[in-house]
Amino acid sequence: MTSHWQELFEQQQSQEYYQHLQHFIASQRADNKTVYPPDDEVFTAFDLTPLSEVKVVILGQDPYHGPNQAHGLSFSVKKGIKPPPSLANIYKELTNDIEGFVTPEHGNLTSWAEQGVLLLNTVLTVEQGLAHSHAKSGWETFTDNVLLRLDQQPSPIIFVCWGNHAIKKGRLITASHHHVLNGPHPSPLSAYRGFFGCGHFSSINQLLIEQGNLAINWQV
């Protein structure tokens, strides 16, 4: 993990909420409950996207709760796993929004993370088969502090908030040089309420180019 993230992590690790959180997760694993993602992949987003290189943040909610899906990046799944419905809808929007985008057969978004897209869930662990089972355990405080740290970054960052949960979280971003893109969640329940046609991926690239940055290659 890069030094800037390491500094933030060390600050959090000294706080009581974080110690309670880690004890909760450790006790879950010790009770033979299956927790996703695996312990060594909980912080993949931070390992792949150094703080100084963050150009875009895509906020998710909590990890996928099926076997072999979650690997520490919001919306992403490991290769060999069928893209879940929300990711399939993200691909559908990309096909309409980005010229030449070809729908992949896999759902691994690592290449986005390596280009400066922080794929951040607001809760970083989940028990197998139980969506939102680790909500209110302390992760929300941790990721609030991540967003507050990102808000302090001098370089402009584009924050992408899909769905009410992410939109509420995105209100932590107040610095005027950042951009926040809000819209409906890509899940099948809400994608037709305005996620399809939102044009966020081309908007991100246009903003990046205006900032003098390279556009994201969304093809995976």
From Swiss-Prot:
GO terms for molecular function: uracil DNA N-glycosylase activity. Its main location: cytoplasm. Belongs to the uracil-DNA glycosylase (UDG) superfamily. UNG family. It comes from Shewanella frigidimarina (strain NCIMB 400). It is found in: Cytoplasm. The active site is at 62 (proton acceptor). The keyword RNA-binding does not apply. The lineage of its organism: Bacteria, Pseudomonadati, Pseudomonadota, Gammaproteobacteria, Alteromonadales. This is Uracil-DNA glycosylase.
